[in-house]
Amino acid sequence: MSNSGEDFQVVTRKKWMARKCLRRRDRHKSESDYLIDCPDVNVEKFQPRLENLCTEMCQSDYFLVAMEALQQQLEGIRKPLERIVCLGLGPFSRTYHALHQAAFVIGLHRHHKIREALYFDPVFRDSEKELIRLFDGCIMSKDCAGKHEATVPTLYYLPHCPYALMHNILWSNWKRETLPNVFLISNSFEMLTMTPRNQDDHITRIVEHCTETPLEDDYEHHNVFNDLSLHTFPQESLPGSNDEAFWTRCAPLKVNEDELITETETSLAALKLESE
């Protein structure tokens, strides 16, 4: 065991933590660089690839069970869905998870024959916007930061989005007559409220009055749809209109665009694009 002092180095906890933080920073930097530097896709070649994935998605157990859960909740209002609003989908031509989520939204759009599908994400490239249009979607002209009113039965799809975005959807529809029009697929409210938060915000207030249906992540590609639930707000479960304390709106929350982009970069695995 000669020269043991040269062969081995004592690594203190502080040094280990510092290295771990640097590795996280480097990984984040590489993912960020990938999203920026990734070559743009050829729309004509990418369209059939997405179409094939939509077909596979609509045949998956995950999709069929999710559609059944959604249909059960729609029976409560006895109206069809008329609009989809998809916020924070991510750069679906460049990331694996976002690509499968895009296929889910397109499949849902077709399955329920919804007349209007609106999308917004600050990371969308022009090619991704064009693909959305080719699949009968529309790009919202500006960032509404979740401030969108459900004047008709509306499915909001917010996969792994910031807390503020989900809060602002509720804030915009904080009326006993409007909340039943909201069908929200997002991170589980039950899980989110396990972390202590402002007791006056809308997610904390509504959690005991909403119906949450977990969408079990049994999709063949793991972690694409983890921790997502369908949230609905049946009118019979809501407090009466005379409950002024409950129905008084608190302030909307600020959605930091950088936070939305950061969550996209750090939570989605890079999708290797192959030129065909």
UniProtKB/Swiss-Prot annotation:
The modification Phosphoserine is found at S30. The keyword Phosphoprotein applies. Keywords: Biological rhythms, Phosphoprotein. InterPro entries: SRR1-like, SRR1L. The keyword Phosphoprotein applies. One of its GO terms (cellular component) is nucleus. It comes from the Eukaryota. GO terms for biological process: circadian rhythm. The modification Phosphotyrosine is found at Y34. Belongs to the SRR1 family. Possible regulator involved in a circadian clock input pathway. This is SRR1-like protein. It comes from Drosophila melanogaster (Fruit fly).
